[in-house]
Amino acid sequence: MANSASGMAVGDECKLKFQELKSKRSFRFITFKIDERTQQVVVDRLGQPGDTYDDFTASMPASECRYAVFDFDFVTDENCQKSKIFFISWSPDTSKVRSKMLYASSKDRFKRELDGIQVELQATDPSEMSMDIVKARAL
């Protein structure tokens, strides 16, 4: 079903790959993009389980918007191993205004399709999704 605000549908592969990340831990991260030709959100890239947060941030385009989910492993102050799934809305300052508006208007609908998101981040610059910020939001 298309999003009434932006007309963007969510591709079935997006939901399927997210379920694989969440339940099987098949991927470390997934990036998604809006395909304006088909008017839907589609999978852009899949990060392998051994990929790092640096691999993830390096995969984000410098001047194009993306949505992403990242399975973040961390150790609490009590020395417990935990994991949280982050939803990241990447809208760099250098991206086109139309693209920023399209991603902003489709975000909430897309996020609702991904059941199991625990933390949300919005970033317009790489510093806004640094490892320090991610760790602070996870704890």
Curated annotation (Swiss-Prot):
Residues covered by the ADF-H domain: 5-139
Keyword Lipid metabolism: no
GO molecular function, one term: actin filament binding
SUPFAM superfamilies (alphabetical): Actin depolymerizing proteins (SSF55753)
Coiled-coil annotated residue ranges, if any: none
GO biological process terms, semicolon-separated: actin filament depolymerization
InterPro entries per UniProt: ADF-H, ADF-H/Gelsolin-like_dom_sf, ADF/Cofilin
GO cellular component entries: actin cytoskeleton; cytoplasm
Keyword line: Actin-binding
Signal peptide (from-to): none
Cross-referenced Pfam families: Cofilin_ADF (PF00241)
Family: Belongs to the actin-binding proteins ADF family.
Function: Actin-depolymerizing protein. Severs actin filaments (F-actin) and binds to actin monomers.
Protein name according to UniProt: Actin-depolymerizing factor 6
Organism of provenance: Oryza sativa subsp. japonica (Rice)
Gene: ADF6
